């Protein structure tokens, strides 16, 4: 006996409802996937990298922009998967751009592979590496254009050697060469204080050295002796009324006015007798009481002044000549003639 199996057929409305729900769910999933792929492709286009891990992202169809210079070139489309594929630039006459298709990366790769250079040797024109290469190429071209002529001069190796200066020593840090230069200048300008110059009169020490030549002091240089004589010797001319011949005395050999007056007073007794500096104490009383003559000096302005009015150092600095004149008003006569005194002090007018 045959058993009849009944096949239940779902109602038409229920089947269509079930089919519609399944198809709508599939459509929604497909739409979500497409939106995600489109967003990823847009992000890839903006960043120039692929963010899909493993390179397994959906295909992003992009048309590559093409430019042709100098001829009828035609652009071609580029299909990319994973990595972004940029446009192809065709340069030339009658050239045509070809289709570029980049294969997607193998599964299981890291997303950092997007930062590695493309296997096809492509580089994004706006990337940092591309700009660096462009700048290097421009610099190289400009350097080639600025090359000097073929005549090249070669410097010897010895000339290129840098001479090292001595190290700075002390504080402030000054090089040794400059310190030696300053020391040399100071030694030249420093006066010789060890050499003491004495007056022109003979002394006991000089006589002892003259007697024993073996122990005589070393001679000084001529320049040092001349400089010392200029500072310690100051000779001035002495004129006396009634004598056409003058005398010279060393003013530096005297320390004050009294010593100078004694020498000049001795000249009044015997003008041509040489002045004996060793016997200055002889006849001091007679010299002090004598007022028959007066002593004048001529300063640097040419005026005649009375000896003893200014300090001794100022007198040595300004005295050029000495005059022995007769006293217009001696004590023994007791008369004073100011007119004659003024006439004697006035310089004679040239004829």
Swiss-Prot record:
Gene3D superfamilies: Phosphatidylinositol 3-kinase Catalytic Subunit, Chain A, domain 1. GO terms for biological process: auxin-activated signaling pathway; regulation of DNA-templated transcription. Transmembrane segments: none annotated. Expressed in roots and seedlings. Keywords: Auxin signaling pathway, Nucleus, Repressor, Transcription, Transcription regulation. Residues 1-37 are annotated as: Disordered. Pfam families: AUX_IAA. GO terms for cellular component: nucleus. Residues 233-327 form the PB1 domain. Induction: By auxin. Residues 21-34 have a biased composition (Low complexity). It is found in: Nucleus. Belongs to the Aux/IAA family. Aux/IAA proteins are short-lived transcriptional factors that function as repressors of early auxin response genes at low auxin concentrations. Lacks the EAR-like motif (domain I) which is conserved in the Aux/IAA family. Homodimers and heterodimers. This is Auxin-responsive protein IAA27. It comes from Oryza sativa subsp. japonica (Rice). The lineage of its organism: Eukaryota, Viridiplantae, Streptophyta, Embryophyta, Tracheophyta.
């Amino acid at each position: 006996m045959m058993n009849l199996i009944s096949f239940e057929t779902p109602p038409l409305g229920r089947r269509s409802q079930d089919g519609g729900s399944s198809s709508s769910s599939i459509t929604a999933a497909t739409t979500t996937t497409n939106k995600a792929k489109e967003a990823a492709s847009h992000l890839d286009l903006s960043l120039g990298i692929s963010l899909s891990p493993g390179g397994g992202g959906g295909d992003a169809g992009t048309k590559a922009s093409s430019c042709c210079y100098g001829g009828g070139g035609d652009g071609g489309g580029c299909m990319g998967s994973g990595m972004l594929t940029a446009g192809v630039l065709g340069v030339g006459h009658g050239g045509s751009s070809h289709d570029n298709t980049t294969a997607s990366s193998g599964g299981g790769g890291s997303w950092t592979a997007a930062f590695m250079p493309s296997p096809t040797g492509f580089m994004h024109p706006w990337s940092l590496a591309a700009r660096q290469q462009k700048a290097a190429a421009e610099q190289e071209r400009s350097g080639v254009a600025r090359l000097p002529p073929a005549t090249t001069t070669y410097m010897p190796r010895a000339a290129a050697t840098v001479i090292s200066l001595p190290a700075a020593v002390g504080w402030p840090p000054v090089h040794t060469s400059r310190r030696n230069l300053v020391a040399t200048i100071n030694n030249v300008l420093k006066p010789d204080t060890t050499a003491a110059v004495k007056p022109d009169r003979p002394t006991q020490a000089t006589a002892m050295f003259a007697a024993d030549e073996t122990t005589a002091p070393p001679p000084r240089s001529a320049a040092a002796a001349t400089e010392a004589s200029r500072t310690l010797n100051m000779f001035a001319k002495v004129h006396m009324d009634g004598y056409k011949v003058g005398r010279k005395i060393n003013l530096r050999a005297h320390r004050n006015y009294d010593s100078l007056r004694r020498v000049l007073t001795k000249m009044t007794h015997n003008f041509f007798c040489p002045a004996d500096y060793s016997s200055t104490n002889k006849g001091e009383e007679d010299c002090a009481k004598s007022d028959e003559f007066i002593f004048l000096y001529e300063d640097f302005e040419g005026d005649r002044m009375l000896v003893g009015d200014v300090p001794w150092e100022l007198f040595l600095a300004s005295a050029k000549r000495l005059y022995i004149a007769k006293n217009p008003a001696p004590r023994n006569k007791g008369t004073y003639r100011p007119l004659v005194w003024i006439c004697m002090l006035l310089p004679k007018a040239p004829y």
